[in-house]
Amino acid sequence: MNIKTGGCSEDCSYCAQSSRYNTGLKASKMVNVESVLEAARIAKENGSSRFCMGAAWRDMRGRKTNLKNIKAMVTGVRALGMEACVTLGMIDAEQAKELKDAGLTAYNHNVDTSREHYPSVITTRTYDERLATIKNVSEAGIHVCTGGILGLGEKPEDHVGLIHTVATLPTHPESFPVNALVPIKGTPLGDSQVIKFDAILRTIATARLVLPSTIIRLAAGRNTMREEKQIMCFMAGANAVFTGEKMLTTACNGWEEDKEMFEKWGLRPMAVEETIQGQQEAAEKVKVDLSKVQASEFSTKAEASL
């Protein structure tokens, strides 16, 4: 869900939300907490296990009120029994800690492409600044969600470079989103050719080999693929999708459409208790229950000795 639309100061060549381009998108203030939680409830009712929230701005500097509201959104989403993910641009170590304390499951901050091709796409934020945010997120104990966009005018070796960057992080990310550029009129990449499907498939398959435990998420551009192509992506190694009304500002496959596809091809959506967050919480519960048993045994022994 886009919790704050447009008006971003960055110059990402692919993005409709940049204030530098005339895309017809109207900027808006951040939505209220309750509207986010209502959207999360609907997502859960339709089978989603994770709710993702994105805000269009460069970073979180000077946004204390926004951060307070976002933490309330995160806590509220978690109270619904869902995982919570946000993408808020660059954040520092203290902001990452605050989000972790609020219950944040994952933080999305894509590296977008290879280090070599990156300057051709964005000039207002460096590659190393992106990696610094990923480091802050990881060190705060939040799961990292980082991937890229295919179709930015890159070469095949840039797909290798993208995967190499992610695979050589100190710890492999929990999630690797694979986006296919949706050209938006008014942006510098608005007239770009659509990326060939075999490039998407090769990227997914390669990522699966070098990131064996990472969730590979089909993200933007999936709605442009025919059903059989989406299934080929799953066969190549993808094992999650973004679904719902919109993928930030671009169209997204709907819940009913995805449910029909999953049922047709024998794909079972992951239950909340099967997610990484769910498994961790189950493990913590076991620890708590075990400590109670041990405390009870100690108390019984103490009484017997008396």
Question: PLM features: residue spans?
Answer:
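Glycine- and other small-residue-rich loops at beta-strand/loop junctions that grip anionic moieties
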Residues: 1, 88, 126, 148-151, ...
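Functionally engaged cysteine thiol sites
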Residues: 8, 52, 85, 145, ...
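Hydrophobic faces of well-ordered beta-strands that scaffold small-molecule active sites
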Residues: 1, 51-53, 84-86, 107-109, ...
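Short coil/turn connectors at secondary-structure junctions
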Residues: 9, 46-49, 80-82, 212-213, ...
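Auxiliary Fe-S-binding modules of radical SAM enzymes
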Residues: 167-306
